[in-house]
UniProtKB/Swiss-Prot annotation:
Pfam families: Globin. One of its GO terms (cellular component) is hemoglobin complex. Heme b binds at residues 75, 110. This is Globin CTT-VI. Residues 17-161 form the Globin domain. There are at least 12 different components in Midge globin. Keywords: Heme, Iron, Metal-binding, Oxygen transport, Signal, Transport. It comes from Chironomus thummi thummi (Midge). The lineage of its organism: Eukaryota, Metazoa, Ecdysozoa, Arthropoda, Hexapoda. Transmembrane segments: none annotated.
Length: 162
C-alpha cells in the first residue's frame, strides 16, 4: 500500500510555492535520509499503529518482528522512492502538473482503501518528527519542509475531495 508514499506527496506541491533555495534545502536534507527506508517506515508505524493496520501484509503483526523482513524493506523502499520522485520535482513551476498528477494518483489509490485525511496527517507528523531527529533542522530547513508539506497536502486533500 503506497499509503505512506502518499503522504509524501510531500514535496509535491512544493514546486508551486517553494523558492529555488527552499527546494534545494528539502532535496539536500532528504538526500541524507532517503536511504533509511526501513527506519522511516518503522518510525511511522511505531508512532501510528493505525497506519500499519491499513497494510494487509503487516496488520496484526509485531512491528519489531517484521522490521527486518524482506517484505517490510521492499514496501519501505516503495514508499521512500515515491517520496523521492515527488521531492525531485520540487522547485520548478513547470513540474506542478506532474506533482498534481502524483497527488491525484495517490488519492485515487488510497481513498478506496479507507485511508483518511487524518491518517495522511499522522504520516506527515511521523515523517516530520523523523526528519527533525535525523537532519540538521534549522529554521530555514523547517520552514522549507513545512511549506513543502503544506502545499503537497493541500493538493492531496483536494484530490481526495474530488
Amino acid at each position: 500500500m503506497k499509503f505512506l508514499v502518499l503522504a509524501l506527496c510531500i514535496a509535491a506541491a512544493s514546486a508551486a510555492v517553494l523558492t529555488t533555495e527552499q527546494a534545494d534545502l528539502v532535496k539536500k536534507t532528504w538526500s541524507t535520509v532517503k536511504f533509511n527506508e526501513v527506519d522511516i517506515l518503522y518510525a511511522v508505524f511505531k508512532a501510528y499503529p493505525d497506519i500499519m493496520a491499513k497494510f494487509p501484509q503487516f496488520a496484526g503483526k509485531d512491528l519489531d518482528s517484521i522490521k527486518d523482513s524482506a517484505a517490510f524493506a521492499t514496501h519501505a523502499t516503495r514508499i521512500v522512492s515515491f517520496l523521492s520522485e515527488v521531492i525531485s520535482l520540487a522547485g520548478s513551476d513547470a513540474n506542478i502538473p506532474a506533482i498534481q498528477n502524483l497527488a491525484k494518483e495517490l488519492a485515487t489509490s488510497h481513498k478506496p482503501r479507507g485511508v483518511s485525511k487524518d491518517q495522511f496527517t499522522e504520516f506527515r507528523t511521523a515523517l516530520f518528527t523523523y526528519l527533525k531527529a535525523h537532519i540538521n533542522f534549522d529554521g530555514p530547513t523547517e520552514t522549507a519542509w513545512t511549506l513543502a508539506l503544506d502545499t503537497t497536502y493541500a493538493m492531496l486533500f483536494s484530490a481526495m475531495d474530488s
